Amino acid sequence: MRALLTFFVAGLLVLSSPAMALFGNNQNSSFASGSNDFVPVDQAFPFNYFQQDHRITLDWQVKEGYYLYQQRLSFSAENVVLGDIQMENGQPYRDEFFGDVNIYTNPLFVNIPMQDWQPGAKLIVQYQGCAKAGFCYPPETRVIDITSFTNGDMAPATMPTQTANPLDTSTPQPLTQQDQLASGLADNWWTPLLFLALGVGLAFTPCVLPMYPILTSIVLGSGKLSQRRALGLSLVYVQGMALTYTLLGLVVASAGLQFQAAMQHPYVLIGLSILFVTLALSMFGVYTLQLPSSVQTWLNNLSNKQQGGSSAGVFAMGAISGLVCSPCTTAPLSGALLYVAQSGDLLTGGVALYALAMGMGIPLILVAVFGNKLLPKAGGWMDRVKTLFGFVLLAAPIFLLERILPEMWSTALWSALGIAAFGWLYHVKNSLEFGGWKQSAVGIIAVLGLFASAQPALNYWFTDSSQQTQTSEVSFIKIRNVEELQQQLALAKQAKKPVMLDFYADWCVACKEFEKYTFHDPAVAAQLKQFVLLQADVTRNQAQDIELLQAQQVLGLPTIDFWDAQGNPVSNARLTGFMQAAPFLEHIQRISN
């Protein structure tokens, strides 16, 4: 069904959703036994450093089959000032749960210049990695004492090894795991072309297209101009608009980390979803979205002071117009800014938004040079295009909420959107300007789309109700520390029930795979009813989390421990790494029996 919706949402969603990537999907890997085949973190990522006067070099020798997250690298200091950090960019990697991130599978060297040393100077380094087989280590912190030095040149040091083009950052700004698009596209030369194409598409939205003839007359002013003069003025106007967009991109990119951190919070995802739904309602004619009258008056007065036909006045008008977003451009522009924020790259942010503005300005240039004859005639088709963009905007919140909603609900939302969109298409087919085979083709597409959209919901409704109940009844008792674990083990012993303890963290890919593919399998869910199910969420890696991990001798996640009905740990039953539903079911059956 999503394939049928792709042409509705491709342009917007390429920008506004961090699109499922990097870390690697390990759902096909499994461990038939509970043995721990993973090495300690210091063997997986041997860490060394050496200081040479006012420079320090950090060195990770990444073991084969393991990788470090770029977005989990962070550097801070006490009693010393860090200069420009130079490090190579990681390799793009895709994961269905966390989106696009970068990883390091080869030795990594980071050079950090320093200045203004004071007694007690320290460098705090944080990092985290995983095994490709589906096993993640908790975040690691190393505190390095900085010896005294004399201030020197703060220019970035030369990399000891050259395996890729270095990525310069004024402050340590690793990319987040969110990610939708930033890591995957930032290094590709065609990124500006993508934004240019998006800008052209935005120019032909119903909120923007009718304004071009009016805008052209304002830009060119009174009097007849040569094509060369008209071309020059329209280019100047577009450059003014592009300047505003470019500055906006630079500002957002410079605050990339703040945007990245905020975008991971469920409240932010819900807020953005409400915003997109609100914008969609305006496209359906529920209300009229426009700037407050006071702002409109101020912008109009400011624009009227500029003289059409003069380069300076036209440039100023273009810069002012870049501050105004119509209902048709607000959501795509928000998506573009989201992409820029995720990249955290000033060059990427500036070039991408400049290309977007240039794309939006191409129709204006054509109209200024060749006249209105190049524009399609206004008519009822524009209202239908406006409604179509309403469905596009409704698709955006579903992509955002998929990250926090159960799969059942996200599937239901996709089905509902598809049924509504293709139902509307079938409803309006008879009012199209053309008839004959073209109208019939639209009707066939609408009917096929309706069936395809309804299929996921029908599959759920006709699934055996007992299986649905089994899936929904899998729930865990949350524990936070060693004391709570001991209390729950004592209660389970009194009830003469075996215990399963699942160590979980939001940054653990395989933990989410366990939750989606294994625990919610109907047969597994039924068997787990015989257990007391405990779960320790160690996402925040606080002191009590570390104490619990050490008490259970947990190297990394996922890790699942078992106790029998007498309260004794089951030897050789520990699971580390992802396991598919079928072998996991056999494993817990052996324990429960």
UniProtKB/Swiss-Prot annotation:
Keywords: Cell inner membrane, Cell membrane, Cytochrome c-type biogenesis, Disulfide bond, Electron transport, Membrane, NAD, Oxidoreductase, Redox-active center, Signal, Transmembrane, Transmembrane helix, Transport. It catalyses: [protein]-dithiol + NAD(+) = [protein]-disulfide + NADH + H(+); [protein]-dithiol + NADP(+) = [protein]-disulfide + NADPH + H(+). HAMAP family: DbsD. GO terms for cellular component: plasma membrane. Pfam families: DsbD_N, DsbD_TM, Thioredoxin_7. Required to facilitate the formation of correct disulfide bonds in some periplasmic proteins and for the assembly of the periplasmic c-type cytochromes. Acts by transferring electrons from cytoplasmic thioredoxin to the periplasm. This transfer involves a cascade of disulfide bond formation and reduction steps. Its EC number is 1.8.1.8. It comes from the Bacteria. Disulfide bonds join 130-136, 207-328, 508-511. PANTHER family: THIOL:DISULFIDE INTERCHANGE PROTEIN DSBD. It is found in: Cell inner membrane. Belongs to the thioredoxin family. DsbD subfamily. GO terms for molecular function: electron transfer activity; protein-disulfide reductase [NAD(P)H] activity. This is Thiol:disulfide interchange protein DsbD. It is a multi-pass membrane protein. Residues 1-21 form the signal peptide. The keyword Transmembrane helix applies. Residues 451-593 form the Thioredoxin domain.
